[in-house]
Amino acid sequence: MLTTETASNLKVLKRLDVITAECVYGMNIFKDILASLSDTFGGRNKSIQNTLRDARRTALTELRKEAYSLGANAVIGIDLDYSEISGGGKAGMLFIVASGTAVIIEQ
């Protein structure tokens, strides 16, 4: 899995398809309160950092599974996008999209 389209030591034999993986995580009210305290007093909020890390890992794992289901042995040009979805005063949701190109590389 690469964030770049090319690497000097890898030869792309075939580009299969653009692939994506999406994950949505609920950010409960307690995490929101802790985040606001961290914002007020400074410092890092480990609870939210852990949620972000879990979301990233899950999205990349799902992206890898999607690539393998197409017969790819690599993913290039990986991009991660994070968004927050909130509405109606309810606890927000973290939405992450991982995208890339499923390829077959020379082994």
Curated annotation (Swiss-Prot):
Family classification? Belongs to the UPF0145 family.
Q: Which residues form the signal peptide?
A: none
The record's listing under InterPro entries reads:
UPF0145_dom_sf, UPF0145_YbjQ-like
- Domain of life, per lineage: Bacteria
By its UniProt entry, which Pfam families does this protein fall under? YbjQ_1 (PF01906)
Question: What name appears for this protein in its UniProt entry?
Answer: UPF0145 protein PSHAa1882
Q: Which PANTHER family match?
A: UPF0145 PROTEIN YBJQ
